[in-house]
Amino acid sequence: MKKNLTEEELHILKNKGTEKPFSGKLLYNKKKGTYYCKGCDNELFSSKSKYDSGSGWPSFYEPININSIVFKKDISLGMIRTEVICKNCDGHLGHVFDDGPNPTGKRYCINSLSLNFNKDE
């Protein structure tokens, strides 16, 4: 895990925190590019799979490479969810749900504070 992370970023990545809905700086980002793990720069999502789910968090219907993430059952907050974790640094990214659009039917609901974005040249 990188050393130059803010307290908020560390809270999300290491302590499985969640940013407030509609507060993330990447929520409305419409630029073409790639989203990386803020903790280790692991390539995670493409802007091609990003969509507006209305949930308040950046949402994607698929990762660039399914092997770049790990899934873990999350029973916190009285709910059963599937946590999405960075495979390289074990950083908490968000959760995945089965209510997304075609072609996958998945909604990867990811915290902006756990992501970096690099615009395509």
Q: Which ranges hold each PLM region?
A:
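A short Gly-Trp-Pro
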Residues: 2-121
